[in-house]
Amino acid sequence: MASQGTKRSYEQMETGGERQNATEIRASVGRMVSGIGRFYIQMCTELKLSDYEGRLIQNSITIERMVLSAFDERRNRYLEEHPSAGKDPKKTGGPIYRRRDGKWVRELILYDKEEIRRIWRQANNGEDATAGLTHLMIWHSNLNDATYQRTRALVRTGMDPRMCSLMQGSTLPRRSGAAGAAIKGVGTMVMELIRMIKRGINDRNFWRGENGRRTRIAYERMCNILKGKFQTAAQRAMMDQVRESRNPGNAEIEDLIFLARSALILRGSVAHKSCLPACVYGLAVASGYDFEREGYSLVGIDPFRLLQNSQVFSLIRPNENPAHKSQLVWMACHSAAFEDLRVSSFIRGTRVVPRGQLSTRGVQIASNENMEAMDSNTLELRSRYWAIRTRSGGNTNQQRASAGQISVQPTFSVQRNLPFERATIMAAFTGNTEGRTSDMRTEIIRMMESARPEDVSFQGRGVFELSDEKATNPIVPSFDMNNEGSYFFGDNAEEYDN
């Protein structure tokens, strides 16, 4: 872990920059999102989309996926070497929805990847603009986090499905760089490491030879990223043990699962960024807004401001509730899938309900769904207040929570107590305290037991009026202390399937 002095802020990671001051960071993040906006406008022109069609979130997602696919070098190389039936490795595409005679129709489009890369580079002053691509990946990841529950993935790696609050960023592609690593939850990192260890157990040659050396370096790097997320010395010491293991196996998997559980109370630092769909940046650029001159931040008021003045539409299936669809997208935009619903509701200004009570499926429409009865509605993405996104897990103390999700991972830096259900979590910690990590385990369990439910996190931090862009008057909300609020509570959300 780099020492405190060399930590880069998210915006620096986001823009691949070295150390910059606040103004330079705002300018480079502004440059990044205006590049996305210019690209989107150009794609709408190419596809001859009307203004309304260009504001359709499903069209935005298709266009975003096309550019991500065009720049996915590893997959492109793989497709060239393993030609599969009916897949042209040089082309990319997806469904574009158009309004015809009062109905929505789906049209499948196909483009040369080379052409998409050219348009993207042209919109980004001739550069590859990797930061912008990562930004789109994070928006897709945040949307997945709000839409799906990763129960099956958790169970497959031997973790408890109720640990879903640790799974932020679990669908991020491997190539998402430092900005991607910053937003990954503790559970996501643990899952990646367990998968790796399991491969090593099953495949004798996994850690051997030239390839094995590279694998080992990747393993240690992932261990260090996870170590950097923990805030207590004992958790970090355990990570050192896992990293230094000569031949990672079941003992390491046990340690990692132990650490993941401990993170429900001794929460890790996980970054949160408001990444918006490309069409939102496109709308702003088209209306003459100069992101680079004005500067932009993913963790301050700017995304809230942008959403206050953007009209985005979504296709709605016959029995879906448009207000619920809006909530889903609002949560995705602010990376708030694992935030306490009490906090989200206060900021949004309307009640944010648990996933199981939403009458809506995912945003994307499957290719076999019937378009006949599809309608479209405006998404309500505005908020009553804004708050600063956090990169810490809040201080480590908790309270009772629900059956579906037994902890939260805060998104907004706002004073509250952090709900968790001690009995449920501590029940998992009986027994195994022997072995080489016994003293650390004992220490971690002791810290967890002394965490007090009522303790307040983010002391004195509040939300701000949308007119208060300099964050001068914090409004500290008061919450009902006994009323926990986790989103995946007792839930039946769909599974995420690749």
From Swiss-Prot:
Q: Which residues form the signal peptide?
A: none
Its Gene Ontology molecular function terms?
RNA binding; structural molecule activity
User: Describe its PTM?
Assistant: Late in virus-infected cells, may be cleaved from a 56-kDa protein to a 53-kDa protein by a cellular caspase. This cleavage might be a marker for the onset of apoptosis in infected cells or have a specific function in virus host interaction.
Alphabetically list the UniProt keywords: Capsid protein, Helical capsid protein, Host nucleus, Host-virus interaction, Ribonucleoprotein, RNA-binding, Viral nucleoprotein, Viral penetration into host nucleus, Virion, Virus entry into host cell
Annotated membrane-spanning segments are none
Q: Where in the cell is it found?
A: Virion; Host nucleus
Region described as Disordered: spans on this chain: 1-21
Matches recorded under Pfam families:
Flu_NP
The short motif Unconventional nuclear localization signal is annotated over: 1-18
GO cellular component terms attached to this protein's record: helical viral capsid; host cell; host cell nucleus; ribonucleoprotein complex; viral nucleocapsid
GO terms, biological process: symbiont entry into host cell; viral penetration into host nucleus
Q: Where is this motif: Bipartite nuclear localization signal?
A: 198-216
Say which family it is in: Belongs to the influenza viruses nucleoprotein family.
What does the UniProt record say this protein does?
A: Encapsidates the negative strand viral RNA, protecting it from nucleases. The encapsidated genomic RNA is termed the ribonucleoprotein (RNP) and serves as template for transcription and replication. The RNP needs to be localized in the host nucleus to start an infectious cycle, but is too large to diffuse through the nuclear pore complex. NP comprises at least 2 nuclear localization signals that are responsible for the active RNP import into the nucleus through cellular importin alpha/beta pathway.
Subunit organization: Homomultimerizes to form the nucleocapsid. May bind host exportin-1/XPO1. Binds to viral genomic RNA. Protein-RNA contacts are mediated by a combination of electrostatic interactions between positively charged residues and the phosphate backbone and planar interactions between aromatic side chains and bases.
| Protein's name according to its UniProt entry | Nucleoprotein
GN (gene name): NP
